[in-house]
């Protein structure tokens, strides 16, 4: 049998919603927006690294990182 602890009593309310699903789409649209923004961020970083997006006065060179 599991032993009750003070930490377990504190954390129990966090687990009380286990198995319950919010009706409808819930926060899925919000998650989709943040995923799209993160994708754009990664795309910009990749383009800067690949030099397909040139920004004035920004050097993308490994030697410039050692200065």
From Swiss-Prot:
Pfam families: PsbH. GO terms for biological process: photosynthesis; protein stabilization. It is a single-pass membrane protein. One of its GO terms (molecular function) is phosphate ion binding. Gene3D superfamilies: Photosystem II reaction center protein H (1.20.5.880). InterPro entries: PSII_PsbH (IPR001056), PSII_PsbH_sf (IPR036863). GO terms for cellular component: photosystem II; plasma membrane-derived thylakoid membrane. The chain crosses the membrane at residues 29-49. Keywords: Membrane, Photosynthesis, Photosystem II, Thylakoid, Transmembrane, Transmembrane helix. It is found in: Cellular thylakoid membrane. The keyword Transmembrane applies. Its main location: membrane. Belongs to the PsbH family. HAMAP family: PSII_PsbH (MF_00752). One of the components of the core complex of photosystem II (PSII), required for its stability and/or assembly. PSII is a light-driven water:plastoquinone oxidoreductase that uses light energy to abstract electrons from H(2)O, generating O(2) and a proton gradient subsequently used for ATP formation. It consists of a core antenna complex that captures photons, and an electron transfer chain that converts photonic excitation into a charge separation. PSII is composed of 1 copy each of membrane proteins PsbA, PsbB, PsbC, PsbD, PsbE, PsbF, PsbH, PsbI, PsbJ, PsbK, PsbL, PsbM, PsbT, PsbX, PsbY, PsbZ, Psb30/Ycf12, peripheral proteins PsbO, CyanoQ (PsbQ), PsbU, PsbV and a large number of cofactors. It forms dimeric complexes. This is Photosystem II reaction center protein H. It comes from Nostoc punctiforme (strain ATCC 29133 / PCC 73102). The lineage of its organism: Bacteria, Bacillati, Cyanobacteriota, Cyanophyceae, Nostocales.
């Amino acid at each position: 049998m599991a032993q009750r602890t003070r930490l377990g009593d504190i954390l129990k309310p966090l687990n009380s919603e286990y198995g319950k699903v919010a009706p409808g789409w819930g926060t899925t649209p919000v998650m989709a927006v943040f995923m799209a923004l993160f994708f754009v961020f990664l795309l910009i970083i990749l383009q800067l690294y690949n030099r397909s997006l040139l920004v004035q006065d920004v050097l993308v060179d490994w030697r410039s990182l050692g200065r």
